[in-house]
Amino acid sequence: MPPRPNKRQQREQEELESLGGPSHEGEVSSEDEVAKRSVKNIAGAGFAALLTPEEDGQDSGDAGSPQPTRKTKKKKKKGPAPPRSQTPVMTEPPQSSRTSPNIPVHPKNEKKATKKAKAREKKAGKDELDKALAELSVNEAEMRKFFGAKVVQANKSTSAGASGSSSRRKPGVLRSNLTHPQPSWWAAKQREGLSIRVLTESETEAKMERQKWDTNEEEKWWTVEYSKKYKSMTMAFMQTVMSGDPEGFWNLLGKLPWHADTLLQLSEVYRHREEYAQAMDFVDRALFTYERSFIGAFTFTSGLNRLDFDHVENRPFFLAIHRQATDLQRRGCVRTAFEFARLLYSLDPWNDPHGALFHLDFLALKAGMSQWLLDVFDLFAARKETEAGVRDSRLNPSLLPGWSYARALALRIDEDANKDGIHTASTSALIEAITSFPSVVPLLADKLDVSLPTSIRSHRNFRIETDSSSLSPSVAALHLLSHLYVQRSFSLWKDAAHCAWFSSTVTSTFSSVSSVLPTTDRHNQFLSLYSNPSPQYSAYRHIMVLEASYRRLFSFIPRHVLNAKSLACDPLPPPTTVTEYNQAFFAGTDDLFALRSRTRQERVADERRLERLIPDAAFRGQLQAFFEAHPNFAERFPGGIVQFAQIAGQLPEDVLEDMMLAEAMGGEGLQDGGMPGQMPGFADFMNEGVDERQEPLAGVDNAPIRLVDHRQENLDAGVGAGADEDDEVEDDDEDEDEEVAPMPVRVLRNLLGRFWGGNTVAEDSSDDEGDRPPPVDDGGVD
């Protein structure tokens, strides 16, 4: 007796019966095949339970379709029996598809399983997407705000370096300790025209004599030096500054992309446009330019390497760090700003030329580095006591009004952290600050909305000064620094407990006020220190760099300082300067855009190009004669007559006529001994003997014409970054293959005809001849 068929086999039999009743032979053959399948199922019953529904469907499909090996065996043994048993399955279902639409059972199961699998994959994909969105919900700007851009960038670098294949594909990464070089930056060489050297012993002694300092054997003073090409670039930069055209800076970067003064000037241009991201990108590039010039002996971590601010070559680096620290404060990265301010202070702590200490009294508390401020204050206070009788113009932080108040607040914060309810040390420090610098009290009270007694408000020592018209330089500096500290640091005192502590301390200290407050030793030492010009200029320069935020404090700067000769690239040079951008500094320097002697190959190439531009030989000779007859005019076009012809075809006729007319009248735009095409006032600006600053140019008629085909595109691609001075000769094949479009010569012909007469132009075979009127006989024989 055959075994009982399973449910699947029974379902197949029911489907076959519903098709219309097969013949008896088909029934017999189907029974035989069912028996064969049953035997196979019994043989593999142990593993049949492990099969999935999809695998069962495949097995059933294979059973219903003829196999090649089985078909050959069936042909030998049974003949046509196997095809008869398979006929109802293969041929009948398509014919009866209208009456029984549910015939393909197994493909339907497969579709259902496929749909379920796709649904599961879609759900898993949604889960992964939700996870990714949850991870990215914290904006990178917030991460930078809380942790600083340095930490976020370091995290990115770590994750990027985890994949070995991607790191191997990176070409060469620019390294820097001060910035994060971007992939969009130009290619950089080793030094980029800058080098650094140690000051000689005689130079160091001269500096100590100028500053009235004692020699410190442990310190080492350095200065940056310019190469010949970098100095030529700086001279062209000064000429562009005097022209007042910001577009000229892009032409300079085409010659030397890594020029710090140009980068800082472009940064100011973008800052005035309120494009702060692009502005700080140029500041980063300027820092990177100087950092590459520092050799291994000049390190920031030793604390003994100094950069001489009296040399103009070093001053762009000071300015770049100051602007970087200021922008970091604007972005809320106070800890990074604190580190940059410390770096700025360490370059020249005895002069502090950019007033880094005026940043640090605020940033130390804001960044949670109050202990550092206390340590520095105590160190210089001890030095002040040991050298009490020595006259020294070195800057001392313990004598500054902002540091005295910041020290009292730092002690108060530490006492609150240690749960010290007595506050003896902080109150004593605050009383000392109030008695030494009472000018801060009314300013800070107004910012904190603290009411002061009338006896204090009306006292002469608590008077609020708004300018320096009736004050001595040292007293004016005291009120200037008082305003500066309150305007920057009043937010640190906004806490209710700090306001109450400040109000109660002031009221209790001055419960009975005499007509004149006794002066303290700290107050007298401050006035003595700021009687020297170097500390005064440090405070003035600090305000001038931060012009946008502290414009109203300019009233404390003397008039002769504001009227002094200075530029945005070098704000307020020090009175003890050794070098500055003047005629002596640029002596023997070649003009970067001057007309140089062209080689034979270049002259031959120019002739071929000019033939393509101006096919008329007679007119071409006339144009060459005019160009060679006016060397001052030719100096405006470093590319030679070809560049002049190209520009002439692009300029309007009236502009070109004015240029040539000015040259034909004697070249009034050029000054004796000046650079070709330089701005009026440039020579006076470079002259050290000039007292008053020359006004910038109102027009640009005498400006040098510089043809630059690609500006930002070439710079971003690194074009010109590695160009050397000796790579100026082009290959002959390139000159021959270069396509030059003919230019319309009618404009030049008309202009030259006005200067040299209309009958001097030779006969021309071009079609333009018919458009011109017949020549006129000037002799009157018509």
Swiss-Prot record:
Q: Which GO terms describe its cellular component?
A: nucleus; RQC complex
Localization recorded for this chain is: Nucleus
**In which residue ranges is the amino acid composition biased (Basic residues)?**
70-79
Intrachain S-S bonds: none
Is-annotated flag, keyword Nucleus?
yes
Instruction: Please tell me where this protein is predominantly located.
Output: nucleus
KW Zinc-finger (keyword) present: no
Pathway assignment: Secondary metabolite biosynthesis; terpenoid biosynthesis
- The Acidic residues compositionally biased stretches are 723-740
- Low complexity bias spans: 157-166
Pfam families given in the database record: Tcf25
What domain of life does the native source organism fall in? Answer: Eukaryota
Keyword set for this entry? Nucleus, Transcription, Transcription regulation
One GO biological-process annotation of the entry reads:
ribosome-associated ubiquitin-dependent protein catabolic process
Please give the residue ranges the record annotates as the region Disordered.
1-37, 49-128, 156-180, 717-745, 758-782
Function, as annotated? Probable transcription factor; part of the gene cluster that mediates the biosynthesis of clavilactone A, a meroterpenoid that features a unique benzo-fused ten-membered carbocyclic ring unit with an alpha,beta-epoxy-gamma-lactone moiety, forming an intriguing 10/5/3 tricyclic nested skeleton.
Protein name, as recorded: Probable transcription factor claV
Q: Which organism is it from?
A: Ampulloclitocybe clavipes (Club foot)
Q: Gene for this protein? A: claV
